[in-house]
Amino acid sequence: QGKVLGEFSVKQGVKTVAIVDDRTAYGQGLADEFKKAAEASGLKVVATEYTNDKATDFKAILTKIKSTKAELVFFGGMDAQGGPMAKQMKELGIKAKFLGGDGVCTPEFMKLGGEASEGNFCSLPGMPLEKLAKGPEFREKFTKKFGAEIQLYAPYVYDAVMVMADSMKRADSVEPAKFLPAIGQTRYDGVTALIEFDSVGDLKGGAISIYQYKSGKLEYVETLGGSAVDLAKADVKEAVAEVKEAAQAVAGAATAVGKEVAAEAKDVAKSAAEAGKDAVKAGAEAVKNAAEATKAAVEKK
């Protein structure tokens, strides 16, 4: 997430960023990766501050950040700190944009941040269900079977279980010592993506989706990361399906028109043949009459 969020910051048109993390493994790791990506993308990190996962008063570090005139504040941490931090930024008159990871992409963040959460950005792993190539089909099957609306992580949990089942099948064992190594060789076409893992066990090409708080709810902004390719594939697949459907419709119409034209041509040919017969008959009659008239004239002389 940190890498993708660093790249997203550049797209926001900012040039300076301040970074705060809560010193937890999650928060610090996220902030460190964000910093690397931000600097690699040409952004200037004007402040790096730290707090902890129990704090609720951030005015001291935010006052320092305000003096740097940072255009964006990135927070590596959870909603319990992120919400109050966003609220205190507003109270201090800090105009910088606020950005965080999935730890602040929660209803609790909105509750704690109140009006100050409006316009802030956060991220969640994966893509929205409607953006997944197999998402609509999964939703339909899920609601039909369970009679309930699908939950956010349902397709990812489903794929996780199916990856384990696939690994057990390939290892021919349900013993963890035997099937866990097989997970590393996974190549599974799941609901969420084509699932493969790198040498350290991370998901290859994992997509990250960006959301923004608007009017008390999260709104999807865009998807970044390797699996954004899957998003493009889904769009292409949909376009191909539409083209195929249109082509079939055209072919069907052409066939119908062809049959109609053929039928009309057959009728015309039949009419022409009958007219030809009548013409030949009339011609023969005329020749016969002419012959008789000639004979009568000769006999008269």
Predicted regions and their residues:
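Extracytosolic ligand-binding ectodomains
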Residues: 1-248, 300-301
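Composition-driven recognition of long, low-complexity, acid-poor segments enriched in small hydrophobic
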Residues: 228-298
